[in-house]
Amino acid sequence: MAIQALLVILAVLLVLLFLGVPISYAIAVSSLTAILSSIDLNVAVLTAAQRTFVGMSKFSLTAIPFFILAGNIMNQGGIAKRLVDFVMAILGKMPGALLVTNIGTNALFGAISGSASAAAAAVGSMIRDGADEQGYDPAVTAATNAASSCSGLLIPPSNALITYSLASGGTSVAALFMAGYIPGIIWALCCCVVGVLLAVKLGYKGTPGKFDWKNLGICTLRALPSLSLIIVCLL
C-alpha cells in the first residue's frame, strides 16, 4: 500500500510538473491523489482536512511571514543601504570591494530578515548599479549575490530552520539557531575568499586611498540601529 501511494505521488507529480503546473499545486494534487487511491473516500476526505488543519495551526510558522515582512519594511526604510555603506567602509579596500561588500551585507541582512531571497533582492539591487558603473561582469556579480545570500538560510533568524524544526517533529528552534551561526559565518567567509580570488584574477580593485576611520565611524553610527535589530530579532 505504501509503495503504491509512493508510485502514485511520483507519477502524478512528474506529469503535472512536465505540464508546467506550479510546484505547490503539483505537490498538493499528487498528495491528494495518492490518499484517494489508497484509502476509502470518506476516510480520505477526513484525513486531508485533518492534515490541512494541523499544518495550518502550527504557531511557529507565523514567524516566517513576520520575518519576511520585517525584511521588506527595513528594505524600504533604507536599512539595506546603511548596511552596504557600513560593510563597504570596512571591506572597501580589499580586491573586488563590491563583491565582498555584497557578501558581508547579505550575511547581515539575512541575520535581520531571516530570508535569503529578501537579502538577495534588497542588497543585490543596490550593488548592481555600482558594479555596472565600475565594469564588473554582471554574471560574476549575480553569482556572488545568489551564493552569498544562502548565508541567510543559516544565520539566525532563519525561516528554513523554523520549517525544518516543524518537519522534523519539533526539534528545538533555539538549538537550531545556535547551530546555524558557525556554518553561516563559515559560508560567508568562504564566499569572501572566492570573491577575492576572482577579483584578483579579473582585475577588480578596491577603493583607492587610505583606510578612512572617520568614514567608518560615521557609517557605524548610521548602521547601529540596523545592527541592533539582529539582537532584537533573536529575542
Where are these regions (language model features)?
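Alpha-helical transmembrane segments of multi-pass membrane transport proteins
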Residues: 1-235
